[in-house]
Amino acid sequence: TAWSLSFYGALLTLICLCVFAPDPYYKILVFLPDGIIITFQVTICSILLSLPLGLITGLGKLSRNRIINLLASTYVEVVRGLPLLVQLFYIYFALGRFLKVPDMVAAIIAMSICYGAYMGEVFRAGIESIDKGQMEAARSLGFTRMQTMFLVILPQAWRIILPPVGNEFIAMLKDTSLVSILAVTDVLRRGREFAAESFLYFETYTMIAIIYLLITLLLSKGVSMMEKKLNYYADH
């Protein structure tokens, strides 16, 4: 498959570079693990915050309350209209005027706010794709609107929501490369530090590209497996 060719090709390239040209490729690889851990931490924390924020936003856009609907819609329009890089700078310096916020925390907040808006649209579309008769049937059985949403609608919508949510996770992982501008020592910043000391820019960024490719391919495979599992249980 295309995934297997891409993943094993990248993995074989990484191994060959480290075995046949350990200086500098193996040295670069040894220098990067701390940055890889930070990249994972930023990604996971941002996912954990953006998912509930996206759900709240999606429900807000579907709310019958005009004020809540307006607030949720405005949040989505404003955030989607600004580049992530601008949001990172704005959150970092705006919070810095009032609070002493660590670089990594500011990066996570900015990533969560940005992707919360995109997730909100995904949740809204997923919920709207479910037949409205489901809501009416549940309400006729005595469920409240909130119970119906969480016990009936969302479990069905999750199958539809998962693929685009997975794509957002992958995009978020790649966008963590931008947090290096806030002095967060992610994998890209660690690579830049090594390149600045050794002047091996081509070799360093080759390794960074391979590492990002391997991580994103693993994440996409995980999402694909979850999707197949959900479809299997739904069909049986």
Language-model features and meaning:
Residues 1-236:
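Transmembrane alpha-helices and adjacent helix-loop boundaries
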